[in-house]
UniProtKB/Swiss-Prot annotation:
Keywords: Mitochondrion, Transit peptide. It is found in: Mitochondrion. Present with 1350 molecules/cell in log phase SD medium. This is Altered inheritance of mitochondria protein 46, mitochondrial. It comes from the Eukaryota. InterPro entries: Chalcone_isomerase (IPR016087), Chalcone_isomerase_3-sand (IPR016088), Chalcone_isomerase_sf (IPR036298). GO terms for cellular component: mitochondrial inner membrane; mitochondrion.
């Protein structure tokens, strides 16, 4: 089992790997050589071991006693992983802003019976107003939402919005307009089964390509974006433990900040940024508008949240 060799920290204006601690969390910092820093500021000596030794650590690797149960500030997603915080942001978490959970569920791979990840979708608290500004706009209401002629007195705008967000033809249009508004979102992917960083990278790429709109995009831009995604994972290799977290922050310009939290070691790793906006937009549109989304449960809860915010 090979573990992460270093923690790379940056602020919004820094490139990954520069040795400067972010102002919003002063005890996150890089250190000389291959040492790492945990959330408590303690120096951690890197440990290297072979994949063949993974079974020796199986008991600790799957220690259920470390799983955090739901409380007033969190919600349960699956019994095998820690509850998801309702709010995440500085100073406890080194993200760009404060986020609030709007949807959660289990993400299945290959078979509906194989639970791979817990998926949480968060919205920036400062950007919640954009939901009503976009989805209540006169143009979208008349063209895609409140389209019944004559208008039905039995259905409110919220009823019509819910129906439109569940419509395979209308949902992508509405969600893409919302993403174009500059709304900031974040996904939290928590493995239910131990995996690898390669699986995280490949799964992210596959989710982008599953969006039908990816077929009509500029192939050179897509490939450049996928190369940026690949570059983000150059600094990490090996296994990803159950109950660790992989975060994807969608910025206003649809670029993405990628990061990873090793729960048992209490370490936060800045993986890098995918600057190509096509990748971020296609990925989050797939999360929120796909006919076959990664987590139907999470998408349903997101729709409920968007309707309540409109």
């Amino acid at each position: 089992m090979r573990l992460i060799s270093k923690v790379l920290v940056k602020t919004n204006c820094l490139e990954v790997g520069m040795r400067r601690a972010p102002q919003w969390y002063s005890h996150y910092s890089t250190t000389a050589g291959n040492a790492r820093v945990n959330k408590k500021g303690s120096k951690v000596v890197p440990v290297l071991t072979g994949l063949a030794l993974a079974s020796i650590f199986a008991k600790k690797w799957y220690d259920d006693s470390q799983i955090k149960k739901a409380d007033a500030t969190s919600v349960a997603v699956d019994a095998s992983i820690s509850a998801f915080p309702k709010k995440m942001g500085p100073p406890q978490w080194p993200f760009s802003t404060q986020y609030e959970l709007i949807g959660k569920g289990v993400r299945c791979v290959s078979s509906i019976t194989f639970k791979a990840y817990g998926l949480g979708i968060y919205v920036a608290a400062e950007d919640k107003h954009l939901v009503s500004e976009v989805l209540d706009s006169k143009f979208l209401s008349q063209a895609f939402i409140d389209t019944a002629a004559p208008p039905s007195p039995e259905n409110s705008h919220q009823d019509n919005l819910r129906a439109a967000l569940n419509d395979p033809a209308k949902a992508p249009i509405l969600i893409n307009n919302l993403l174009d508004s500059g709304i900031r979102l974040m996904s939290k992917n928590t493995p239910i089964k131990a995996g690898s960083f390669k699986l995280l990278m490949d799964g992210t790429k596959k989710s982008v390509l599953k969006n039908p709109d990816s077929q009509s995009q500029d192939k050179d831009r897509l490939e450049a974006g996928f190369q940026e995604l690949h570059d983000c994972f150059r600094s990490v290799k090996g296994l990803v433990a159950r109950d660790d977290d992989f975060f994807i922050e969608l910025n206003k310009d649809c670029s993405m900040n990628l990061s990873y939290y090793a729960r048992k070691k209490d370490e936060f790793v800045i993986l890098g940024t995918v600057k190509e906006p096509l990748i971020g937009k296609l990925l989050f549109a797939h999360y929120l508008a796909a006919v076959d989304p990664p987590s139907p449960e999470a998408r349903k809860e997101v729709i409920d949240a968007l309707v309540s915010l409109s």
